[in-house]
Amino acid sequence: MKVEDFDFDLPEELIAQTPLLDRTSSRLMVLDKKSGEIKDQHFTDILSYLNEGDALVLNDTRVLPARLHGTKDETGAHIEVLLLKQKEGNAWETLVKPAKRIRKGGTITFGNGALKATCLEELEHGGRILEFSYEGIFYEVLEQLGEMPLPPYIKEQLADQDRYQTVYAKENGSAAAPTAGLHFTEDLLAQISAKGVEIIFVTLHVGLGTFRPVDVEDTANHKMHSEFYRLTEDAANRINKIKATGGKVVAVGTTSIRTLETIASHNEGKLVAESGWTDIFISPGYTFQAVDALITNLHLPKSTLIMLVSALSNRTNILAAYNHAVEQQYRFFSFGDAMFIH
């Protein structure tokens, strides 16, 4: 299929720049994946679509305040560093701006010396392998010095950094939030659990590649970025049991769906305890083996994420739903409204 087939007109003013005061006050567009029927609801109405014996699968990754501002020791020049992926020990793959100022052996100081970095290797496109030195616990130092790496389409500063974390975020490692989960509060999760719905966690650390535009014409030629995922034995067993007894598996976010489908795709549809790196690309024609329904946000035109949701329903239904969302003034992208495809 052509990437152009997944385009739609989106007025810029519908891109949500700030989160709503109440996480659960978002709207919820409900799409019947087979018939294409659309209903306009509120996010708390998700309760009526979840039943006893179903599984709600959420990604418990935690966004790192991964954007750092420092100075080049040799000249005092301002350097911006974005943490991308942890390597061995205290070494990280990073994106440095301006990259030309930091060559192999160059050093950077952050926050009055609380954190220092040495460049071990130069990569293409501004990438650098930096080794960090610090006292104490790295993630605590990051919390003090780092900023949230908000998506490029968010132009406003975030007043409360916790609003770019889910309420159940636990496992450090993401460069971006699994945004479908931002709509949940602890109270709503408790109400869902009280209905007899099993709440199950997976981990997938979201990389910045999630914002990278698709730069090929044909979807068959697209190469996905890879992201780390993990599923525990307990979680795998619980999901398998729910599927065996006829319950629905409802994934919260495209990251949860990619984790489950990665594992199911090479275990004959079953889920097993597993961790690794996935570059699964789900687009129309894909046969889902683990997931029945999806709670997600409204995605960018021509993105791999709109291709994924088109695979769960079909391209015609999804584009009709997205055009409806534009007409009804839904809020789009990370801080926007939600969609339930079932």
Swiss-Prot record:
Primary localization class, coarse: cytoplasm
GO annotations of cellular component type: cytoplasm
Record has S-adenosyl-L-methionine as a keyword: yes
Keywords, ordered alphabetically: Cytoplasm, Queuosine biosynthesis, S-adenosyl-L-methionine, Transferase
Biological process annotations from GO: queuosine biosynthetic process; tRNA wobble guanine modification
EC primary class: transferase
SUPFAM superfamilies associated with the record: QueA-like
Subcellular location: Cytoplasm
An annotated Gene Ontology molecular function: S-adenosylmethionine:tRNA ribosyltransferase-isomerase activity
Recorded metabolic or biological pathway in which this protein acts: tRNA modification; tRNA-queuosine biosynthesis
Record EC number: 2.4.99.17
InterPro entries assigned: QueA, QueA_dom1, QueA_dom2, QueA_sf
Reaction catalysed by this enzyme: 7-aminomethyl-7-carbaguanosine(34) in tRNA + S-adenosyl-L-methionine = epoxyqueuosine(34) in tRNA + adenine + L-methionine + 2 H(+)
Stated family: Belongs to the QueA family.
PANTHER family: S-ADENOSYLMETHIONINE:TRNA RIBOSYLTRANSFERASE-ISOMERASE
Subunit structure comment from the entry: Monomer.
Function summary: Transfers and isomerizes the ribose moiety from AdoMet to the 7-aminomethyl group of 7-deazaguanine (preQ1-tRNA) to give epoxyqueuosine (oQ-tRNA).
Protein name: S-adenosylmethionine:tRNA ribosyltransferase-isomerase
